[in-house]
Amino acid sequence: MGKAQRTKGAAGEREICELIFQNLGIQVHRNLSQTRDGGADIKLNPYSIEVKRRAAIGNIYEWMDQASNGCDPGERPIVVCRADRKEWLA
């Protein structure tokens, strides 16, 4: 993964953190060790959130598998994705 892709992904994760705060009043943070240790991009108990920010929406089933694999016991996976110049989908 190139630097531009990592930057775009991190920006998407920050957008979702901000949207969660604006809509739910809950402060959440990115999982900065996700690349090294695996796991979800964002944890919001009982949810494990995988964020995808891409030029176009890809294989959502693969993303859901990734989100499921990043869950701790008792958590529910959520995939949040956005294609360029489109709205977020969950």
Where do the protein language model's features map onto the residues?
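Catalytic phosphate/metal-binding cores of nucleic-acid and nucleotide-processing enzymes, i.e., regions
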Residues: M1-A90
